[in-house]
Design a protein with these regions (language model features):
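Periplasmic-binding protein-like
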Residues: 2-15, 35-37, 75-80, 133-144, ...
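Solvent-exposed, acidic/polar segments of extracytosolic/periplasmic ligand-binding ectodomains
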Residues: 257-336
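Extracellular/periplasmic Venus flytrap/periplasmic-binding protein
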Residues: 41-42, 48-157, 196-204, 266
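Beta-alpha junction/loop-to-helix N-cap segments that form part of ligand/metal-binding clefts
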Residues: 1-43, 52, 111-120
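Loop/turn elements at helix/coil->beta-strand transitions in domains of secreted/extracellular proteins
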Residues: 5-10, 29-34, 46-48, 71-75, ...
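Surface-exposed patches in mature extracellular/periplasmic domains of secreted proteins
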Residues: 13-14, 78-81, 216-225, 245-249, ...
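Extracellular/periplasmic periplasmic-binding protein-like sensory domains
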Residues: 153-228, 238-244, 295-331
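Sec-exported extracytoplasmic/periplasmic mature domains
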Residues: 3-8, 24-32, 65-73, 94-102, ...
Length: 336
């Protein structure tokens, strides 16, 4: 309807990967343009989508590296909601961990439905799994409102962040807003932006958002920054192309650079993914995050994982002459 009836030039949106994948065939058929602002599982590349959220190598992989190097984790719980993003991300993470020498018996994988609230049995299993004498960490792709009862049950069973740290990919300022964050203090999240980051751009953005919404307690979060970056880039690309035509703007987007909110520069690459910093934040009592680690430079998002046999030889480059989203470097063939 937005494309065929309203004739919109661009869409900024979709939340879950399910919604994005549902919209994708329509976008490609009607030649629409989508800026997708949420972290996702990778393994996808479309001419009609710019992925301004994190790919796995801009969130999941660095988070695991942090837990290995800084916290000495050797045993892993991959806990997620049962849909495409957690399942694909955990498939990548399991392969990555095995490439690091982690054995199958040191990886526990668990999936729960959306909105899951009874965590007693699962947390008990995690506690037992973590009692084998090896440093255990939880990598969480649990989505939405299921997170709060999960963390509460960790506390109920006496599991602290020092005992078994949890790093989450779907818990941010908005999810913690209005909740008692005490059970979550010390646990971690991996994003490309936190509201607590100190920069002039961030101060201006927060002030403008709170003024617009009429609430000086309203929080900001990573998908908001990704949307902000995408919109500024699209505006620059339209100015560069001199038109809102999708094909012209899509090509003009490549190489566009704008300031992000963390004090560095976001660049749109030929694979329709951003260069972004990766930050690890520790949850505080007020629901904000203290940044405890960040990459020294921005990281280019990778559409295809290096750790899955099905995609390790694939690359995405939407510039001429290649103009391909899944080019196999071993066969020299493009599949789309």
């Amino acid at each position: 309807e937005l494309l065929a009836k309203e004739k919109v030039d661009v869409i900024f949106g979709c939340w879950t990967s399910v919604s994005r994948k549902s919209a994708l065939p329509v976008l490609e058929e009607l030649n629409g343009l989508l800026f997708y602002p949420v972290q996702y599982e990778g393994e996808e590349s479309s001419k009609n989508v710019f992925y301004t959220g994190a790919a796995p190598n801009q969130q999941a992989i660095p988070a695991v590296d942090y837990l290995i190097k800084e916290m000495g984790a050797t045993r892993w719980v991959l806990a997620g909601t049962d849909y495409v993003y957690p399942r694909t991300t955990n498939k990548i993470l399991a392969a990555y961990l095995k490439s690091k020498g982690v054995k199958d018996e040191d990886i526990m994988i668990n999936y729960t439905p959306f909105g899951h609230s009874d965590w007693q049995g699962i947390v008990s299993d995690i506690k037992k799994f973590g009692s084998a004498g090896k440093k255990t960490a939880v990598v969480s792709t649990i989505n939405g409102d299921a997170n709060i009862p999960f963390y509460k049950e960790l506390g109920n069973q006496g599991i602290s962040a020092e005992d078994i740290p949890v790093v989450a990919f779907s818990v941010g300022e908005e999810e913690l807003s209005g909740f008692d964050a005490a059970p979550l203090v010390g646990h971690l999240a991996a994003w490309n932006y936190f509201q607590s980051v100190e920069s002039d751009e961030n101060d201006e953005f927060i002030e403008g958002w709170q003024r617009y919404i009429g609430d000086d307690e309203r929080v900001t979060n990573d998908p908001m920054e990704a949307t902000y970056i995408g919109f500024k880039m699209w505006a620059k690309a339209v100015e560069k192309a001199g038109t809102t035509d999708v094909d012209e703007v899509e090509q003009a987007m490549i190489g566009i650079a704008v300031p992000n909110l963390t004090g560095s520069i976001a660049v749109m690459n030929a694979n329709h993914h951003l260069s972004k910093p990766v930050l690890i934040g520790e949850i505080q009592e007020d629901g904000q995050f203290e940044v405890v680690w960040e990459t020294p430079d921005t990281v280019i998002g990778d559409a295809w994982s290096d750790f899955l046999p099905s995609s390790k030889n694939l690359m995405s480059d939407w510039t001429a002459p290649l103009r391909c989203g899944n080019f196999d470097v071993t066969t020299g063939k493009c599949s789309g």
